[in-house]
């Protein structure tokens, strides 16, 4: 019988090599998975996939000469783990893109400023001109009824207009608030996130008017003239000169805020701070 000792030693050495590779794989996987939130991070899952690919290649190179049962089992185990994480990453990417597309379609199909008030978050109590016609009629009827104390039962029997007899009034489940000294019930105004900003953006995009009111700006100019010059009290300024000053001042302010906003964006912030304006002055307004 031939001596099988070298073959046994070679098999044992191969098994030890596989064991060392698996121990290093376990250590590296623990290093990646110990980071909090690695499951929700694409970078963490990609690192784990790269580690599994690397050790899979090492096992295949180590078993290139002789495929034993241990090699085949370990290679299948590492390959299965790698495939699981690849599938998980692909599913997460698909879900992310699906949610993004759904949000884009929802945003394109609805208008935040002109759309209907389906969530009862928009209030029409800040002016009668912005109030729907049916609510305007209801509020006027309530005021007439509350102010006129001589109304009899005949006036309470039904509305004076027969066309409005079958229409129901506003829901009693709406949140209302009573103001002191007033008989009319007003609702608290609430905005959805981003709705007020969209209204202001569309307002300033459609108009070419000045941003500052003319009367306060004119008072400010006259006050500066009176306090800064010895003969300011006797001076008079034309309206077109005030308009020119206002246009120049607003152009300067808009340019300054644009530059400061770029500086805050460069600092990876969305909030404009005083340090951004100071840095803009140092960079672009050295003469001031």
Curated annotation (Swiss-Prot):
GO terms for cellular component: chromosome, centromeric region; condensed chromosome, centromeric region; kinetochore; nucleosome; nucleus. Residues 178-193 have a biased composition (Basic residues). Disruption phenotype: RNAi-mediated knockdown impacts chromosome segregation leading to abnormal chromatin distribution. Disrupts mel-28 localization to kinetochores. Leads to cleavage furrow regression and failed cytokinesis during the second embryonic division. RNAi-mediated knockdown abolishes the localization of hcp-6 at the centromeres of mitotic chromosomes. Its main location: nucleus. The keyword DNA-binding applies. GO terms for biological process: embryo development ending in birth or egg hatching; establishment of protein localization to chromosome; kinetochore assembly; mitotic cell cycle; mitotic sister chromatid segregation; mitotic spindle assembly; mitotic spindle organization; negative regulation of mitotic centrosome separation. One of its GO terms (molecular function) is protein heterodimerization activity. This is Histone H3-like centromeric protein hcp-3. The lineage of its organism: Eukaryota, Metazoa, Ecdysozoa, Nematoda, Chromadorea.
